[in-house]
Amino acid sequence: MIKKLITSVLFLSTATLCFADTNILKVYTYDSFISDWGPGPTIEKKFEETCKCDLQFIGVGDGAALLARVQLEGKQTEADVILGLDTNLIERAKETGLFAKHNKTLDLNLPITWNDDTFIPFDWGYFSFVYNSEKITTAPKSFIELAERSDLKIIIQDPRSSTPGLGLLLWVKAVYGDDAGKIWEGLAPNILTVTKGWSEAYGLFLDGEADLVLSYTTSPAYHIIAENDFSIKAAIFDEGHYMQIEVAGKVLGSDQSDLADEFLEFMISERFQSIIPTTNWMYPVINLKSNLDKAFLSPISKNKSLIFDPKTAQEIRGPALNEWLEILSK
């Protein structure tokens, strides 16, 4: 009996020591990334196969909520890496002084040249309003047409908490400039609800609560590939579509700095990037060895691709948000 007890104690002690020796990398990201159907579970498994570590993804609402969380926690944050900001937020993120430079030479395949020294892209896509073609036979081809269609109800996301919501704000601004307010005045009666994040908005759309939802031109690819459903389509606007490039960055002063660097290197490898298209339903940032499914063929030509540089996005964000809040509160 005593021998069994000693053996048990030794086993538990050894297990505890092994656990204590395992490096833990904490990555803050948005909720849909770590959902059962998102890329998180597969990425966690693949990274842990080689890192000899415990990769822990921590869901923090939607993309814009990530930055708010890190700002709130400041230097006391437990995060080693933040994954899920985008180009519209990285200037604000840099101003916090909480992120380290990556010091990497990047070989990326993006529609634009990437030269940021702090954040590294992991996927990209175009915002679009998604609809069910079995219910809507003629989709709007512009924001003006959408605003004039009183028969259509739309769901959008809050630009204060959601990167798609902020992307929509800047999309309207990129197309209409000083006349953006008039577009929002026209759209306001059509807005069924404003959700905190993308997942909630898309779920309501799939439940039939609205005619269109703010999402991505690649969203139909999910329904085609995973469900063999060709009815969900992206409305293509003649005036162009705003691009989203999602990024990750290392937290300055992380206790796992080397491991964080290893993860960021892994993030732009074939092993990570090959997971993105059919789990996050976005485009990879490198040339993959195998071709993407034809469902991912982009309907957006280069001259219809819209994006503000990070500094301009930061300058526009505040006034555009105030304008949006004022109009939608009427």
Regions found by a protein language model. Name each.
Residues 24, 28-40, 61-65, 77-210:
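Extracytoplasmic ligand-binding site segments that recognize negatively charged/polar headgroups
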Residues 41-57:
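Short alpha-helix C-terminal cap/hinge motif
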Residues 88-92, 206, 210-231, 280:
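A ligand-binding cleft/hinge motif common to bilobed small-molecule-binding domains
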Residues 99-106, 117-121, 144, 224-242, ...:
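Short beta-strand->loop
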Residues 112, 125, 184-188, 194-195, ...:
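Periplasmic-binding protein-like
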Residues 128-135, 173, 244-257, 275-278:
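A bilobed periplasmic-binding-protein/Venus flytrap-type ligand-binding module shared by bacterial periplasmic
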Residues 251-308:
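Mature extracytoplasmic/periplasmic domains
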Residues 293-330:
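Extracellular/periplasmic bilobal clamshell ligand-binding domains
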